[in-house]
């Protein structure tokens, strides 16, 4: 077997239909999904075929003859009649471009089949030097590779493809009676089914992503609100610190005044002890000393409180800076989430508009 017979000249995907053999009016789909439809060159028999396989079954096995005509019945649907198979095939494509490519390749193969028949009738050897078909997968093989006794058999086989006048009229009537509107609807229906399944999957994924992003957005908003409250508390604490500093200054001044008073008393006592005057007032001196001790204790306590407040103030300032940084990061993340949510909404809107 020739390798050219096993390799397609051109391949595409389409929804395959056959005319109802009973009514000759309705189309019967070959399946729910698009199938691969290919042009093949059979070098052994020197013929071109259109073949489509569904599972283990050949859905289309049509030999292209010069008498065949491929008819576009809509922007995405085309059909041709095969008199040898006694049926009409229909193909529904996903786009008009694919239909045009298939129709152009049909004309090329049809012309190549005509030239092959003419050469075989003349008894000459024919090669495909000037008539090589453009292949999407492999280079085409020669149109005719046999000579001699096999030509008579080839001539008889291809001549049998030519329909008689009665058969031609019957095929014309079959095509005219075919429901073009139903054909278009069938092809569009299967194409739209595939498209809708893809869109539905994309919408489900987008909705799931949107729900997740909304949840993350709510969490970020809650964290941002907590950080704002923490910053407000720290600012309130910082506002109280200057008042405590003023209280310390007043206490320090009182301590200084009392220390000066104690020094004055000590000097007076010293003067009295060196003179011949009366003994000092012991009760007043003890009272003054007790006041000095109390003031010194109070001063030490205030200094300890001041150091503690200064440490707290530094910690509060550092905490406030950290909180501000956290608020800034949260605000940036919130902006990013809002932007992503906006893009998601636009994408969903485009998908909804594109959906039929």
Swiss-Prot record:
Sequence positions bearing Phosphoserine: 120, 159
WH1 domain span: 1-113
Coiled-coil intervals: 94-122, 191-353
Region called Required for interaction with NFATC2, residue ranges: 1-80
Subcellular location: Cytoplasm; Postsynaptic density; Synapse
Chain segments carrying region Disordered: 136-169, 244-295
UniProt GO BP: G protein-coupled glutamate receptor signaling pathway; negative regulation of calcineurin-NFAT signaling cascade; negative regulation of interleukin-2 production
Knockout mutant characteristics: Knockout mice show severe autoimmune phenotypes, with lymphocyte infiltration of multiple organs and hyperplasia in lymph nodes by 10 weeks of age.
GO molecular function: G protein-coupled glutamate receptor binding; identical protein binding; protein domain specific binding
Keywords, alphabetical: Coiled coil, Cytoplasm, Phosphoprotein, Synapse
Tissue and organ expression note: Expressed in the cerebellum, hippocampus, lung and thymus.
GO cellular component, as recorded: basal part of cell; cytosol; glutamatergic synapse; postsynaptic density
Superkingdom of origin: Eukaryota
Pfam families: WH1
Function: Postsynaptic density scaffolding protein. Binds and cross-links cytoplasmic regions of GRM1, GRM5, ITPR1, DNM3, RYR1, RYR2, SHANK1 and SHANK3. By physically linking GRM1 and GRM5 with ER-associated ITPR1 receptors, it aids the coupling of surface receptors to intracellular calcium release. Isoforms can be differently regulated and may play an important role in maintaining the plasticity at glutamatergic synapses. Negatively regulates T cell activation by inhibiting the calcineurin-NFAT pathway.
Domain free text: The WH1 domain interacts with the PPXXF motif in GRM1, GRM5, RYR1, RYR2, ITPR1, SHANK 1 and SHANK3.
Family note: Belongs to the Homer family.
This protein's name: Homer protein homolog 3
The encoding gene: Homer3
């Amino acid at each position: 077997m020739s390798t050219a017979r096993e390799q397609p000249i051109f391949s595409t995907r389409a929804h395959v239909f056959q005319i109802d053999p009973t009514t000759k009016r309705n189309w019967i789909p070959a399946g729910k999904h698009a199938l691969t439809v290919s042009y093949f060159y059979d070098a052994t028999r020197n013929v071109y075929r259109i073949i489509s396989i569904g599972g283990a079954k050949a859905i289309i096995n049509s030999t292209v003859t010069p008498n065949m005509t491929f008819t576009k019945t809509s922007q995405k649907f085309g059909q041709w009649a095969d008199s040898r198979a006694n049926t009409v095939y229909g193909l529904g494509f996903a786009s008009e471009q694919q239909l045009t490519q298939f129709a152009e390749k049909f004309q090329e193969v049809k012309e190549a089949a005509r030239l092959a028949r003419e050469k075989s009738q003349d008894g000459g050897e024919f090669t495909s030097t000037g008539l090589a078909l453009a292949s999407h997968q492999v280079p085409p093989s020669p149109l005719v590779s046999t000579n001699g006794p096999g030509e008579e058999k080839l001539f008889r086989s291809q001549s049998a493809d030519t329909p008689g006048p009665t058969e031609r009229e019957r095929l014309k009537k079959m095509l005219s009676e075919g429901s073009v509107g139903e054909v278009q609807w069938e092809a569009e229906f299967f194409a739209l089914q595939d498209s809708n399944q893809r869109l539905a999957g994309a919408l489900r994924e987008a909705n799931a992503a949107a729900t997740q992003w909304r949840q993350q957005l709510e969490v970020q908003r809650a964290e941002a609100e907590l950080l704002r409250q923490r910053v407000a508390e720290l600012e309130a604490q910082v506002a109280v610190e200057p008042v405590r500093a003023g209280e310390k200054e007043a206490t320090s001044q009182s301590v200084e005044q009392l220390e000066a008073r104690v020094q004055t008393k000590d000097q007076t006592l010293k003067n009295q002890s060196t003179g011949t005057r009366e003994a000092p007032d012991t009760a007043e001196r003890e009272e003054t000393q007790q006041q000095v001790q109390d003031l010194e204790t109070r001063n030490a306590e205030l200094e300890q409180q001041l150091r503690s407040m200064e440490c707290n103030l530094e910690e509060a300032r550092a905490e406030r800076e950290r909180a501000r940084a956290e608020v800034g990061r949260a605000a940036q993340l919130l902006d990013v989430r809002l932007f992503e949510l906006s893009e998601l909404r636009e994408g969903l809107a485009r998908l909804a508009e594109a959906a039929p």
